[in-house]
């Protein structure tokens, strides 16, 4: 059993209030590895994709990879539901002037835990728009790290 750090800040601020980060216990060794999903958008292509993830095992993990070639525009709807413990890692790579709108709906049942971890790499002129809807009676966590590597790249949440 390991502890995952959620919302790790580069500088500890307001630490005395205990609001810098959250720790959750995670059993990576015994977690069910759900099939990886990939969505690719070719240069100048415009499309929409839907991804549904259900975590019914005691611990379940999934990786989603989104890759956009230069000039591509993609809208992705990620629907995640956890009856137990679910961790979804979304890796994003945006080429020059590519645009991604990522809409995530996360829900956790009363005994559930849903965790979303997004990493994104944005080239020059690329843009990521993130919309998150966090629902449920259980615990819901979200972590996001976006690298703006080129001029005029952007992130909106």
Report residues per predicted region.
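Short, Gly/Pro- and small/polar-rich lid/capping loops
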Residues: 1-35
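Conserved beta-strand/loop scaffold segments within soluble protein domains that form the structured core
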Residues: 26, 33-157
């Amino acid at each position: 059993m390991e502890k995952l750090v959620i919302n790790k800040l580069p500088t500890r601020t307001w630490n005395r209030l205990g609001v810098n980060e959250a720790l959750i216990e995670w059993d990576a060794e015994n977690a069910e590895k759900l099939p990886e999903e990939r969505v690719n958008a070719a240069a100048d292509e415009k499309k929409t994709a839907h991804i549904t993830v259900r975590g019914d095992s005691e611990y379940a993990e999934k990786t989603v990879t989104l890759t956009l070639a230069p000039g591509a525009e993609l809208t992705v709807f990620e629907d995640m539901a956890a009856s137990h413990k679910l961790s979804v890692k979304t890796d994003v790579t945006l080429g020059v002037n590519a645009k991604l709108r990522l809409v995530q709906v996360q829900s956790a049942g009363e005994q559930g835990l849903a965790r979303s971890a997004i990493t994104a790499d944005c080239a020059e002129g690329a843009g990521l728009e993130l919309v998150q809807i966090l629902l449920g009676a259980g615990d819901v966590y979200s972590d996001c790290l976006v690298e703006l590597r080129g001029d005029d790249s952007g992130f909106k949440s």
